[in-house]
Amino acid sequence: FGVNTGFAVWDSKQRSLLQVCSLPIHKAMERVRSLYDEYKAGIGDKVIVRVEDPRQRTWFGTERMSREMERKKLQGVGSVKRDASIWDDYLKELGVEYEMVAPKRNVTKLTQERFKALTGWQKQTNEHGRDGAMLVYGF
């Protein structure tokens, strides 16, 4: 859980997704830096990063779980919260424009079929990639 992070690039001029994937957090950070470097050099478009921030969520759906299941779920939540903190610090230091987004305001956990129908994205995706794409889709 939490090994890979969803990553997507939305082109607001073309109104289309350019990339949807899942990759380790350090690789996602390298891609953000690369896109931002291109923008600063005058060869790329403006970059706005949106990060899902579970620190803004107040419930985690553990009410009907056993103690063991709840413990595992909350460990995963802790790891995702830590990732959000890391992103927050990294993006602030990088100087790129960004927004931390509360999970409830984002459409997540779409099936591959539903995602294709909604976005028109035809390539293979996983849940992480689709969740990342829904953070930027239509933005």
Indicate residue ranges for each PLM-predicted region.
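Phosphate- and other anionic-substrate recognition elements at nucleic-acid/protein interfaces
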Residues: F1-F139
